């Protein structure tokens, strides 16, 4: 998982210097495009999107657009859903993937 709010993240020092608050975008790798597909199908609160401009939780599969990323790479932008509901949904979707 990548999130600039974690001290072990390579972007942590830059984020700490440049940001007052750390954004709600995290990245993780599920290994394969198939697992990403299963994750997105199972997640009922997450919408597949290429733009992070709304208030809902969205996920983007960068490899499908030709970006130089792993087929299992996902960027997740956390929305304003109830935290407990979102965590439960993401946990269940990851288990399903």
What are these regions (language model features)?
Residues 1-43, 60-67:
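Conserved small-domain helix->loop->beta segment predominantly found in fold-type I
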Residues 21, 31, 48-49, 55, ...:
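N-proximal accessory regions
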Residues 41-54, 93-97:
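A common structural junction motif
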Residues 57-97:
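PLP-dependent enzyme catalytic core of the Aspartate aminotransferase-like
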Residues 11, 15, 52, 83-86:
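Bulky hydrophobic/aromatic packing residues
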Residues 22-24, 53-55, 70-72:
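A generic structural signal for well-ordered coil/turn residues at beta-strand boundaries
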Residues 2-5, 51-55:
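Short catalytic/ligand-gating loop segments at beta-alpha or beta-beta junctions
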